[in-house]
Amino acid sequence: MNMFNAHIPSYLVPKNLNSNWNVGFILGILLILQILSGLLLTFFYVPCKEGAFESLSRLVTETQFGWFVRLYHSVGVSFYFFFMFIHIIKGMWYSSKYMPWSWYSGIVILILSIVIAFTGYVLPDGQMSFWGATVISNLLEWFGKAKVITFGGFTVGPETLKRFFILHFVLPAVVLVIVLLHLYFLHREGSSNPLTLAEAVALLKFYQLILFSDVKFLVIISMFIGPQVGYGIWTLFQADNDNSILSSSENTPAHIIPEWYLLLFYATLKVFPTKVSGLVAMVVVLKLLIILVESRSKSQAVSTAHHHRVWTTTSVPLVPALFLLGCIGRMVINLDLIIIGIYGVLLSTTFVQKLLDSSRVRA
């Protein structure tokens, strides 16, 4: 209880926090809701080729409020990643890279969340899910037995659904443990604030004022989640229409489009000519976020010129460059898009390298 009291209600935070610091709380609540809705779905889902698609169809049409649980679990992951990307951008903007263990644990949460989302994307056994999994399975041909171990065979089949179901069930528990570590490292080093990473003089307890601010923000977000679940207002957060069709290995979709939060990594696979080069590019994009923490200067974090921040000419274009790659992931690929995509990857790596160089100069 003393540890809980020290890390939650009695935890001291800077007095000048703004709404950007509500996002971490929102992410925790969304993660818990995803786990709870997923547990409810496990009572009805059948992880086999013959029953996966049909079991979810029966859940939506024949079970009371089954449609709500199914759609919330599908839509909730989009909101989860939306706020996670905002949380990452906020960390870059407000120099959270100066808290390396919090940054590293956050990146691990991101990577595991991507794996969980992809395995969950495959489980409904829809047309787009099947062919999306086929694309990834083809990439693993270079890893020999890793492909058979992961997919249960040389192609996507019944064993794939069973293994992905186990991963999708177990990995969220791992994420919860890392989230606790993330909170521990954050509270050990102290929260950042909009002005500086130096220890703030004006502090207040997390409970009541800050907690009520988080809850107020959560209520506002729920006003967007409800209409999205019921009416699908934002098409970007909705699944592709082809995923409402039972998968068929004989009919290939005209254009494979994964969920929007996977578009950045899918684009890096599309714009490079070979599987190996595309896979390397995808790893490089993830590596960019990891090595950002190495751009922290050894000098004091306080600077009236804000040199400790990343809003310099070499780093601000990083987010638009990655956003451009995500847009390419939704388009039918052609030579022009390939050139633009390759330039986007090169520009992103250049921006991060410049950021590292400038930090060495300042240090």
UniProtKB/Swiss-Prot annotation:
Gene3D superfamilies recorded for this chain? Cytochrome Bc1 Complex, Chain C
The reply on keyword Transferase is no
Q: Where is it mainly found?
A: mitochondrion
Question: In the UniProt record, does the keyword Aminoacyl-tRNA synthetase occur?
Answer: no
Entry GO CC:
mitochondrial inner membrane
Please list the residues that bind a ubiquinone. Answer: 187
- Give the membrane topology, semicolon-separated if more than one: Multi-pass membrane protein
Which residues make up the binding site for heme b b562?
A: 73, 168
Please give the start and end residues of each transmembrane region: 23-43, 67-89, 102-122, 164-184, 210-230, 271-291, 309-329, 332-352
On cofactor binding, the record's note says: Binds 2 heme b groups non-covalently.
Pfam families the record matches: Cytochrom_B_C, Cytochrome_B
Q: Which InterPro entries does the UniProt record give?
A: Cyt_b/b6_C, Cyt_b/b6_C_sf, Cyt_b/b6_N, Cytb/b6-like_sf, Di-haem_cyt_TM
Q: Where in the cell is it found?
A: Mitochondrion inner membrane
Hey, what's the signal peptide range on this chain? Answer: none
Cofactor(s) the protein requires to work: heme b
Q: Which GO terms describe its molecular function?
A: metal ion binding; ubiquinol-cytochrome-c reductase activity
Which UniProt keywords are given for this protein, alphabetically ordered? Electron transport, Heme, Iron, Membrane, Metal-binding, Mitochondrion, Mitochondrion inner membrane, Respiratory chain, Transmembrane, Transmembrane helix, Transport, Ubiquinone
Residue numbers binding heme b b566: 87, 182
Any one GO BP annotation for this protein: mitochondrial electron transport, ubiquinol to cytochrome c
Could you tell me what this protein does? Component of the ubiquinol-cytochrome c reductase complex (complex III or cytochrome b-c1 complex) that is part of the mitochondrial respiratory chain. The b-c1 complex mediates electron transfer from ubiquinol to cytochrome c. Contributes to the generation of a proton gradient across the mitochondrial membrane that is then used for ATP synthesis.
Additional information: Heme 1 (or BL or b562) is low-potential and absorbs at about 562 nm, and heme 2 (or BH or b566) is high-potential and absorbs at about 566 nm.
Q: How does it assemble?
A: The main subunits of complex b-c1 are: cytochrome b, cytochrome c1 and the Rieske protein.
The record's similarity note reads: Belongs to the cytochrome b family.
Q: What is this protein called?
A: Cytochrome b
Q: Which organism is it from?
A: Theileria parva
Instruction: Give the gene name.
Output: MT-CYB
